[in-house]
Amino acid sequence: MNRKTGTTTVGIRVKDGVILAADTQASLDHMVETLNIRKIIPITDRIAITTAGSVGDVQMIARILEAEARYYQFTWGRPMTTRAMANLLSNILNENKWFPYLVQIIIGGYVDEPTIANLDPLGGLIFDDYTATGSGTPFAIAILEEGYRKNLGIEKAKELAIKAVKAAGARDVYTGSKKIQVVTITKDGMKEEFVTL
């Protein structure tokens, strides 16, 4: 079975926090399944992941990470950092490389510091200031490269993330162009909102 799906998710790290954004359309081949799917999944109150790929695989990964985060908190009395969770996820994905999870994930959070990482299905891990996943990546990255500055404030970073997903939605048929899910993570916690275009 060779069916095309797609999405666009982005992550941006600035000094005051992390922005994750994603379209809310789920597609299969030429059909739109729904316009209201959440592609950003909270793992803790300070860490979330974005989804590009198999829904079932990413749901399984989210359950594993939630359990590991609770176990870490219980064992050590402090929350797992985003960097530690990204490394754990990299190991999980690499362990399964012969029967891989069909996902590309952005993990973002603010535990000790704002952190963004991109993981491929085989566990390849890249920490960066901004990243994108999914079929709309070329369009989103072009916007991020043009607009990103290390001194961006959290509100400007949110505007840039929305602009990147919106640009992908205008050019990539598998990326939704009607609504964007946005999650902001700062030292004060996590906030989710939806932007209608």
Curated annotation (Swiss-Prot):
EC number of this enzyme: 3.4.25.1
The keyword Protease is assigned to this record: yes
GO cellular component: cytoplasm; proteasome core complex, beta-subunit complex
Keywords: Autocatalytic cleavage, Cytoplasm, Hydrolase, Protease, Proteasome, Threonine protease, Zymogen
UniProt enzyme class: hydrolase
Catalytic reactions on record: Cleavage of peptide bonds with very broad specificity
Residue ranges of the propeptide: 1-6
Positions of the catalytic residues: 7 (nucleophile)
A molecular-function term among this protein's GO annotations: threonine-type endopeptidase activity
Biological process according to GO: proteasomal protein catabolic process
Localization annotation: Cytoplasm
CDD domains: proteasome_beta_archeal
InterPro entries to which the protein is assigned, alphabetical: Ntn_hydrolases_N, Pept_T1A_Psome_bsu_arc, Proteasome_bsu_CS, Proteasome_sua/b, Proteasome_suB-type
Ways its activity is controlled: The formation of the proteasomal ATPase PAN-20S proteasome complex, via the docking of the C-termini of PAN into the intersubunit pockets in the alpha-rings, triggers opening of the gate for substrate entry. Interconversion between the open-gate and close-gate conformations leads to a dynamic regulation of the 20S proteasome proteolysis activity.
Domain of life: Archaea
Subunit structure: The 20S proteasome core is composed of 14 alpha and 14 beta subunits that assemble into four stacked heptameric rings, resulting in a barrel-shaped structure. The two inner rings, each composed of seven catalytic beta subunits, are sandwiched by two outer rings, each composed of seven alpha subunits. The catalytic chamber with the active sites is on the inside of the barrel. Has a gated structure, the ends of the cylinder being occluded by the N-termini of the alpha-subunits. Is capped at one or both ends by the proteasome regulatory ATPase, PAN.
Entry similarity comment: Belongs to the peptidase T1B family.
Function: Component of the proteasome core, a large protease complex with broad specificity involved in protein degradation.
The name this protein goes by in its record: Proteasome subunit beta 1
Organism: Pyrococcus abyssi (strain GE5 / Orsay)
